[in-house]
Design a protein with these regions (language model features):
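Non-catalytic beta-strand/loop surface segments
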Residues: 1-34, 56-92, 128-182, 206-231
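Short beta-strands and strand-coil junctions in structured, solvent-facing domains, enriched
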Residues: 31-36, 106, 193-194
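Active-site SXXK
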Residues: 40-54
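M16/insulysin-pitrilysin zinc metalloprotease superfamily fold
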Residues: 53-56, 87-118
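Short amphipathic alpha-helices in soluble, non-transmembrane regions
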Residues: 97-103, 197-204
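Non-catalytic accessory/assembly modules
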Residues: 112-116, 132-140, 187, 191, ...
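Non-catalytic, conformational "gating/processing" segments within enzyme and secreted inhibitor domains
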Residues: 118, 167, 171-203
Length: 231
């Protein structure tokens, strides 16, 4: 396994293997706990928006770059991270690296795309949580377990908060958290290490890290001295 850090702060972890395929993941240090006040579920909503148009790619281009060549892509949001995953034949690795750098920098979400994807996420909330007794249970547990820490908010959020989100929120969130010094690029598979380094330097190297600090959650959870119950 090899590790290095670019001048802009991007951490790179790679492991060369055999087999003709390669897996690329980009981990961003932002998740549900970082949702803006009154915008629970926003990190997860933003994950969906990252598959939309960029300056040089049309909507859903990641499906074309992965599924059309026999690969796949996916993403997930947790409390502490948002992760984007791509698996493709090795000869398509360079395109995926370019595309991941492209959406890190040049995401362009318009109002129509934003509204469309918000409806998808709200429907996901209704189906997986509100319409499912177990979904409601697991959604309620964090609020019962935590008093102050943002972990108390469910990653999927609430319908009211999702509907309150705006396009300006999207732009601020992208500029604040989707930056090279807040990300880890992981590449595992069949590739030449020297060639991989060259591609990463070419596509991610020019990405500038903003001068301002990355906001971090500093709220401390008080010690629990008794059981938490909800009837």
């Amino acid at each position: 396994m090899r590790q290095r850090t670019l001048a802009n702060g991007l951490q790179v972890v790679s492991l060369a293997t055999n087999g003709g395929t390669v897996s690329v993941q980009v981990w961003y240090r932002v998740g549900g706990k970082d949702d803006p006040a009154g915008r629970s579920g926003f990190a997860h909503l933003f994950e969906h928006l990252m598959f939309k148009r960029t300056k040089h790619m049309p909507d859903e281009m990641f499906d074309r770059l992965t599924e059309d060549v026999g690969g796949q892509n996916n993403a997930f949001t947790a409390q502490d991270m948002t992760v984007y995953q791509d698996e493709v034949p090795s000869n398509h690795l360079e395109r995926i690296l370019w595309a991941e750098a492209e959406r890190m920098v040049h995401l362009q979400v318009d109002q129509a795309s934003f509204e469309s994807e918000r409806k998808v996420v709200v429907e996901e909330l209704r189906e997986r949580v509100l319409a499912d007794p177990y979904g409601r249970l697991f959604n309620a547990l964090p609020e019962l377990c935590f008093e102050r820490h943002p972990y108390k908010r469910p990653v999927i959020g609430s319908e009211a908060d999702l509907n309150a989100a705006t396009l300006d929120d999207v732009r601020r969130f992208h500029a604040t958290y989707y930056r090279p010094d807040n990300a880890v690029l992981i590449v595992v598979g069949d590739f030449d290490p020297a060639q991989l380094d060259g591609w990463i330097d070419r596509y991610f190297g020019p990405v500038k890290a903003p001068a301002g600090p990355i906001p971090r959650v500093t709220e401390r959870e008080p010690a629990r001295t008794q059981d938490a119950r909800q009837e």
